Amino acid sequence: MAATSSSPPCNISASSLLLRQPSRSILKVFGLLPPVSRNNRKLGRLTVTRSNLAQDFLGDFGARDPYPEEIASQFGDKVLGCQSTEHKILIPNASVLSLSQLQCSPVSSSQPPLSGDDARTLLHKVLGWSIVDNEAGGLKIRCMWKVRDFGCGVELINRIHKVAEASGHYPSLHLESPTQVRAELFTSSIGGLSMNDFIMAAKIDDIKTSDLSPRKRAWA
């Protein structure tokens, strides 16, 4: 009769199993499986069952309100930073507002025009405009639009004029060709650029022009 070999006994503790990410069957053996809550929903003739096992097993993560004992311990005085989460609503000042949200103001003839450096800084806040020399030896800003036809060019000029009339600061508008419109801005009373010119340029940038642009051709 052949001798039978016996394997050594295997001692497995519950703690060693839990450290190895136990499966549902192992948790069930040791009575550690949390109750499964199911939510049934009716979708037509079908019943959809959703299990909340993962949520119940992991618990509820996230912030919570402090307990009365924690408030009494004045724990907020022992941490860095501000323990208050009150939000303060501040009124935005002119430095953070868009130029198109500002209003043109009267310009005195004794006021000096903007320097080239200041003009180039403000130029970053408008789209499609460039700085050129004006006839008086100062600076002005210019923008060009390509439109679909002559009627679209006239419509764009009318839209710009309407915005300029509401602001009280008028650009020089030119229909250079049936498909091209040019606008130029500078303050004639000071012979150069003022803040009003860039405010007006930003307001012109907000005008809708997509319906006046040339149609793009699709090549097969």
Curated annotation (Swiss-Prot):
Name of the featured protein: Probable pterin-4-alpha-carbinolamine dehydratase, chloroplastic
Localization per Swiss-Prot or TrEMBL: Plastid, Chloroplast; Cell membrane; Nucleus
Protein family (similarity comment): Belongs to the pterin-4-alpha-carbinolamine dehydratase family.
Q: List the SUPFAM superfamilies.
A: PCD-like (SSF55248)
Q: What keywords is this UniProt entry annotated with?
A: Cell membrane, Chloroplast, Lyase, Membrane, Nucleus, Plastid, Tetrahydrobiopterin biosynthesis, Transit peptide, Ubl conjugation
The species this protein was found in: Arabidopsis thaliana (Mouse-ear cress)
A Pfam match is Pterin_4a
- Keyword presence, Kinase: no
The Gene Ontology biological process terms listed for this entry are: response to abscisic acid; response to salt stress; ribulose bisphosphate carboxylase complex assembly; tetrahydrobiopterin biosynthetic process
Summarize what the UniProt record says about post-translational modification. Answer: Ubiquitinated by SDIR1. Ubiquitination leads to its subsequent degradation, thus controlling abscisic acid (ABA) signaling. Ubiquitinated by AIRP2. Ubiquitination leads to its subsequent degradation, thus controlling abscisic acid (ABA) signaling during drought stress.
| Catalytic activity annotation | (4aS,6R)-4a-hydroxy-L-erythro-5,6,7,8-tetrahydrobiopterin = (6R)-L-erythro-6,7-dihydrobiopterin + H2O
Alphabetical list of PANTHER family matching this protein: PTERIN-4-ALPHA-CARBINOLAMINE DEHYDRATASE, PTERIN-4-ALPHA-CARBINOLAMINE DEHYDRATASE, CHLOROPLASTIC-RELATED
Claim: Ribonucleoprotein is one of the keywords in the record: no
Its job: Involved in tetrahydrobiopterin biosynthesis. Interacts with and acts downstream of the E3 ubiquitin-protein ligase SDIR1 in abscisic acid (ABA) and salt stress signaling. Regulates the expression of the bZIP transcription factor ABI5, which mediates responses to ABA during seed germination and salt stress. The SDIR1-ATP1/SDIRIP1 complex plays an important role in ABA signaling through the ubiquitination pathway. Acts downstream of AIRP2 in regulation of ABA signaling during drought stress.
The kind of enzyme this is, by top-level EC class, is lyase
One GO molecular-function entry: 4-alpha-hydroxytetrahydrobiopterin dehydratase activity
Transit peptide (first-last residue): 1-50
Q: Which InterPro entries match?
A: PCD_sf, Pterin_deHydtase
Topology relative to the membrane, per the entry? Answer: Peripheral membrane protein
Assigned EC number = 4.2.1.96
Alphabetical GO CC annotations of the entry are: cell periphery; chloroplast; chloroplast stroma; nucleus; plasma membrane; plastid
Q: How does it assemble?
A: Interacts with SDIR1. Interacts with AIRP2.
